[in-house]
């Protein structure tokens, strides 16, 4: 009787632990950068070094984060024409092999 009670207790503990592990999100430890405010000012293409898109479902807005030559990160609205033009410019710039 004591063995079956101990076994039942052990199984319940294991089941509780397993459900907690399975209920966690897939990327619980991966950091997510979100943009909460987007710039309305056009940034000169000469000041831009790179960009990345923010598309995580954990973020309230889709955005593009531009990194400037000075190291600043600026959030922008991806649907604006100047943002799309800047992305195209950076893509072309990064595809061109440097001598």
Curated annotation (Swiss-Prot):
It comes from the Eukaryota. Disulfide bonds join 34-59, 35-75. It is found in: Secreted. Pfam families: IL8 (PF00048). Residues 1-23 form the signal peptide. GO terms for molecular function: CCR chemokine receptor binding; chemokine activity. Acts as a ligand for C-C chemokine receptor CCR2. Signals through binding and activation of CCR2 and induces a strong chemotactic response and mobilization of intracellular calcium ions. Exhibits a chemotactic activity for monocytes and basophils but not neutrophils or eosinophils. Plays an important role in mediating peripheral nerve injury-induced neuropathic pain. Increases NMDA-mediated synaptic transmission in both dopamine D1 and D2 receptor-containing neurons, which may be caused by MAPK/ERK-dependent phosphorylation of GRIN2B/NMDAR2B. Belongs to the intercrine beta (chemokine CC) family. Monomer or homodimer; in equilibrium. Is tethered on endothelial cells by glycosaminoglycan (GAG) side chains of proteoglycans. Interacts with TNFAIP6 (via Link domain). This is C-C motif chemokine 2. It comes from Sus scrofa (Pig).
């Amino acid at each position: 009787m004591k063995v079956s009670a101990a076994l039942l207790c052990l199984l319940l503990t294991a089941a509780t632990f397993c459900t907690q592990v399975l209920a966690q999100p897939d990327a619980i430890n991966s950091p997510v950068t979100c943009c909460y405010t987007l710039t309305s000012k056009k940034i000169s293409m000469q000041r831009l070094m790179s960009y990345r898109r923010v598309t995580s479902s954990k973020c309230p807005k889709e955005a593009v984060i531009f990194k400037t030559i000075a190291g600043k990160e600026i959030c922008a609205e991806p649907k604006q024409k100047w943002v799309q033009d800047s992305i195209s410019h950076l893509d072309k710039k990064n595809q061109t092999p440097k001598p």
